[in-house]
Amino acid sequence: MSIDNVKVDIGKAEIGFETGKLALQAPGSVVVTSGDTTVLVTTVANKSVRDGIDFFPLTVDVEERMYSAGKIPGGFFRREGRQTEKAILACRLIDRPLRPSFKDGFRCETQIIATVLSVDNENEYDILALNAASLGLQLAGVPLESAVGAVRMSLINDNWVVQATNSELEDSVFDMVVAGSLNPKGEIDIVMVEAGATDNAFAKIDEGSAAPTENIVADGIDMSKEFISKLIEAQKELVAKRDVPEIDWPIIEDYSEELKSQISEAFGSDIETAMAITDRAERSEKQSELQEQAVEKFLDEEEDNTKAIKLAFKSIVKNTVRDRVLSGGARLDGRTPTDIRNISAEINLLPTVHGSSLFLRGETQVLNVTTLGMSRLEQMLDTIDTVTSKRYMHHYNFPPYSTGEAYPMR
């Protein structure tokens, strides 16, 4: 098997993709590099669908290897441990923009594994892995609506910098990861934005740096499209060099368009009325009532198409809500796109803890509890990063009663 590669300049960074050298048994295998950071990304999809699968079984794993940073794992056994928080977040970052890009009805079990082989502590591996995963899926012949490209945009000294190094990020006020896909017109559609202020944001703004206003952030997103397009073109260039197999993948149809059309004709106006109810509980109850009526009306006892009816009904509800927002400018609870929920907060709820507060936004509540400790209680970190401890720890719990449901506590 020949080795093929392609390189692309993204700002000051050079990103290289190579295939045909490592993991030759994986249908989609890509080694991606930037600086001295190297990641192997493999993609494998089964050719058949498991019995009883009614969802798309996509898994993304990020494997950080301690040797990539020249370290030996801690602990008695000196073995690689469980995934770090950073690796878990990288998995989610890869999953979010890629999952919607698969063709509707594709249910074959698909696995993406990103193994960090080397890190230079200047070029982060997450964006590299995301782009390589998109490329690997194409090399494996998996049915995608479009390739996906992604970049990190950082607001440094009042200018947007693409793929900034970790040294440059120390002066950043605002960072965001922007992912996009190519639409039929050849333009970039943004499919994901993950953004947030940096640890140095307040200090930098106090020193005179521009705050990330809505217009500034919009400019950064718009600027990212050029680089996303270049990454997608690089992926296409490498795919064109390879003999990508044409596979007749099984595509599952959840429901027929005829069934959806019949349900829409019979219950479309009632669904529109139900979605205009601003009270959440009342709206949910009315939606369930209409769904039961749809099942009763269109049930085929010989085929038992209950599931198909419910999925078609759900699709109609989704389209109704979307159309209502786009055409009428009203969301489910009656707010316009620019309105926010009522916000309030209380403090000192609990008598013996160091600090407590209750934050409310609409019907959403968050109870926060703070505990202060000595510096020796810092969390020790055994990761590939240069940071070896963490003094601020934020634990998030989401019990089932938060959404009025009952299921096992994990």
Describe these PLM feature segments.
Residues 73, 77-79, 93, 111, ...:
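Small-residue-enriched alpha-helical segments and adjacent helix-cap loops
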Residues 2-4, 26-28, 54-56, 147-149, ...:
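A generic structural signal for well-ordered coil/turn residues at beta-strand boundaries
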Residues 1-4, 10-13, 27, 38, ...:
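Alpha/propeptide regions of enzymes that mature by internal proteolysis
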Residues 143-277:
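Mobile "lid/hinge" segments at catalytic clefts and subdomain interfaces of large enzymes
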